[in-house]
Swiss-Prot record:
Annotated protein name in UniProt: Glucose-6-phosphate isomerase
Gene3D superfamilies per record: Glucose-6-phosphate isomerase like protein, domain 1
Pathway info: Carbohydrate biosynthesis; gluconeogenesis; Carbohydrate degradation; glycolysis; D-glyceraldehyde 3-phosphate and glycerone phosphate from D-glucose: step 2/4
Record's subcellular location: Cytoplasm
Domain of life: Bacteria
Classification lineage: Bacteria, Pseudomonadati, Thermodesulfobacteriota, Desulfuromonadia, Geobacterales
Gene Ontology process terms (BP): gluconeogenesis; glucose 6-phosphate metabolic process; glycolytic process
HAMAP family reported in the protein's UniProt record: G6P_isomerase (MF_00473)
Amino acid sequence: MNAHELWQRYQTYLLFDADTGLILDVSRMAFSDDFFASMEPAMQRAFDAMERLEAGEIANPDENRMVGHYWLRSPELAPDPAIAAAIRETVDRVTAFAADVHNGVVTAPRARLFRNVLVIGIGGSALGPQFVADALGGHGDRMRPFFFDNTDPDGMDRVLETLGADGLAETLAIVISKSGGTKETRNGMLEAEAAYRRAGLDFSRHAVAVTGAGSELDRTAEAGGWLCRFPMWDWVGGRTSETSAVGLLPAALQGIPIRDFLDGARTCDTLTRRRETLRNPAALLALMWHHATRGSGSRDMVVLPYKDRLLLFSRYLQQLIMESIGKELDLDGTVVNQGLTVYGNKGSTDQHAYVQQLREGTNNFFVAFIEVLKDREGASLAVEPGFTSGDYLSGFLQGTRTALSEKGRESLTITIPAITPRTVGVLVALFERAVGLYASLVNINAYHQPGVEAGKKAAGGVLALTGEALAFLRREGGTLSATEIAAALGRPEEAETIFRSLLHAAANPDHGVVMEAASPLTRSRFSAR
């Protein structure tokens, strides 16, 4: 297309919504003129499915659960008045608790105020809170956020070293786990508890739980007399929990206006309920994914936010989209191996990294640019006569978009006016709705994650086998190879797992395992001190 034709196409397909300030440009996606008409019946069926979901129909058949994250910002839509009341009560409790912490009503035992918040969680219990904290945080934060988001000992040590003993005395810990049985979160809680104990502090006087009623974590918090407990409901999945206490409590403690955040999500929900496809940005996103991937996950989505505050957005979207869309089976039980791979960093940094391949390498992707119109608070320096650093950032986004388009590389652009609690809420709600609509278009269950459970089960098997191997070494004595240990345990097929586990054990002093390296490495021998 020539410049005039591109301008006409841009005007035809540009969506602007005044209530949210959202602008969506899909003109650089190479769909045909009849694409929307051909997809309209499927899109209307997706709208129908979404209406049933919001009305409380069982939308996660594998777990026989409702899916209610949209109710979190519009409680009046909940199918049960008790659910609506619980949502409102939780937001009020989160707001009140944060105010009490900020005002010194809830205090640290050895400090006047809590000044830090340590969030202990993984997956949806960390990615959303991390994204929001980074996007909206600043020098005016009421509390500094820190995270244990993995079962990596060194990672937790780095956080604790940053806090120091004095900082830990001023740190409120939030443990987030719906089931209370997530091992990574359990490990983080135990590591934190030990750190508080080493500092002469009582963990329970610093601890808050966000969990399901009656869960293992809920019972632990109740028995230990923790400061407070907030609910996680079974109808809210981890990756869609950012507008629940999972996301609201850390944000409120940081000093972020959570009601503005909820208002942005609620306003976007209203917008994305429109059944007029070309006026619904979530529907347009879902259809662009379907067009680009042919409804089969054949292309990756590269997320390029041209804003440092949105650096973590691609990580958040990785879980939201890939855990929802990446499924082996469709709703009819047919093997489809569906998915949509998401990766990205930030612009214009990525122009000096992998944009070279995007323009000239394998064409197996489309780009989702995210643009923020407002550069900063206050005036900017003119780095050249008439131009600021922000002008350059905008120019690089537009230039990259043009350079990709010249090579037939597809892209869409999402524009918001500024980074505020409200617009971040809009972004969260926009992609949540797009995921649900796309899942309907490709006939999959977006709200379960059997692959995650399979990985957890396999990890449990590895740990059990490692325990057997270590016990055998200690019991039998001597120096043995992994092959010999596997044979002695009657598990010759597990020699590789045993070798890898003993390799790790020998590198750490905790298990008292000594390795005598050999060549090839797999013939190394192990003994117990």
